[in-house]
Design a protein with these regions (language model features):
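Surface-exposed, charge/polar-rich loops and edge strands
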Residues: 2-6, 34-434
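Intrinsically disordered, low-complexity proline-rich tandem-repeat tracts
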Residues: 15, 25, 29-35
Length: 434
């Protein structure tokens, strides 16, 4: 395994690289990570983030073991690419760095149902609890759904439409205990581009090994490559490992609109960050270590915390810790006991947090709903390195990746990935951007 510290004579790889060890492609003469003309240009449109991908590149099953997937390493300063396997990841981290994970757990939330009056088949994707006996779901087909429509769920149970909540979602009154029913009869919500039904293997494959809190309707896929051995190697190198929570919501299935990126929004998603996580991240930054974010959901959580710490106005709604739960808390089944609420009474709107002292603001624990949408140009305040997958063209997660590495570098990397046979999307290969 290549040791990145030894490869550069023990020097900080962010400042100097031994180009003689660069086994990949150099994509250009630009050595200044902050000098990316394409990121400073205004008027970017969704079409600027398009690329062609033949169906054969889409991974429909994961590799075994998890860390046998390929790892493309992008160096922003050198504008270069290297090729490894994911098992090599720990060699890129040093003592004093930290890794931040998203420990949300994917629910087996895709259920089949029948309309008793017609016998018509309906597929439901339950995305979040909205209160006692109430869940919000995407419905297919949903054109004829209306208030009072009753569905009989396969395996027992029922779901009755309470109201339409958006163009594609409905609020249902469900029979309890619904979580137990979903665990027994639900399917894992693997993406439709896999062009197959979920099976028993997806119960493990479409879940990170560290998943803890149920609430997501899609996996934080950057974490799927990690194994217990990966964490053992990281800890042996003196790397601290902490977690945030962000439940991936139905907005992950909603494409961005064609045309200008500016002015578009993401649906709110629930997140939490504990005091321990904030302390480790603050300590890492304070001593000059690097913060490695595992995935775009982790990145959005950390950057939301940075906005709050800096007193910036952000699209954020705080969770309320009230006896018996609140509408916000009930949506996700409550929050972490050691998190604090932000934004006073928890009403929808703008939240602020002013950090004490001078210099870079310190992150503080929070829980609530974030609409953080990151696209070029963007000044990252917390994240120094990003672990992510290869994403759909023009998706919000691809835009975040382009904001972090530069649009031209990412598009070049995707072409290099196709040329060298990488596997794309949720069950595909991985990318490390340093």
């Amino acid at each position: 395994m290549l040791d990145r510290r030894n490869a550069s004579g023990g020097k900080d790889l962010r400042l100097e690289r031994d180009t003689g060890l660069n086994a990949g492609a150099n994509l250009g003469p630009n050595s200044d990570a902050d000098s990316r003309p394409e990121d400073t240009a205004s008027g970017l449109t969704l079409e600027d983030f398009h690329y062609e991908l033949p169906q054969d590149f889409i991974a429909r099953r994961p590799l075994t073991p998890r860390d046998s997937s390929r790892l493309m390493v992008l160096d922003r300063a050198a504008q270069s690419i290297e090729h490894f396997t994911f098992g090599s990841l720990p060699s890129y981290l040093e003592e004093g760095d930290c890794v931040v994970l998203n420990d949300t757990k994917v629910m087996p939330c895709r259920l089949q149902a029948t309309r008793p009056e017609t016998g018509g088949k309906v597929e439901l994707l339950f995305v979040r609890r909205r209160g006692a006996c109430q869940w919000e779901a995407l419905v297919r087909p949903g054109r004829k759904m209306k208030e009072g429509t009753l569905l009989v769920l396969h395996g027992g149970g029922s779901a009755e439409v309470v109201e339409r909540t958006s163009a594609s979602t409905f609020l249902f009154r469900v029979s309890e205990p619904f979580e137990e029913y979903m665990e027994s009869w639900g399917e894992m919500p693997i993406p439709p581009y896999m062009k197959r039904h979920a099976d028993a293997g997806d119960r493990d494959d479409y879940q990170t090994v560290y998943a803890k809190t149920p609430g997501s309707c899609a996996a934080p896929t950057a974490g799927l490559h990690f194994t217990r051995e990966t964490f053992q190697k990281l800890e042996a190198r003196g790397v601290e490992i902490v977690k945030v929570l962000l439940h991936v919501g139905p907005g992950t299935f909603k494409p961005l609109k064609p045309g200008p990126i500016a002015g578009q929004t993401l649906d709110p998603e629930y997140f939490e960050a504990t005091a321990e996580t904030c302390q480790v991240v603050n300590r890492t930054r304070g001593r000059g270590g690097r913060v490695f974010a595992v995935g775009t959901t982790t990145t959005r959580s950390l950057e939301t915390l940075a906005d709050l710490a800096a007193g910036a106005e952000v699209a954020f709604r705080a969770s309320v810790a009230a006896e018996g739960g609140s509408a916000a808390a009930a949506d996700v089944g409550g929050g972490a006991a050691d998190s604090t609420s932000v934004g006073g009474d928890g009403a929808a709107g703008v939240a602020k947090r002013v950090a004490p002292g001078d210099g870079a603001p310190s992150l503080e624990p929070a829980k609530g709903w974030t609409e953080k949408f990151i696209y070029p140009p963007y000044d990252f305040k917390v994240v120094d390195a990003l672990i992510t997958n290869f994403h759909l063209p023009g998706s919000s997660v691809m835009l975040l990746t382009c904001a972090f590495a530069g649009r031209e570098l990412i598009l070049s990397a995707y072409e290099e990935a196709k040329r060298t046979g990488y596997r794309f999307y949720s069950y595909g290969d991985s990318m490390l951007i340093i």
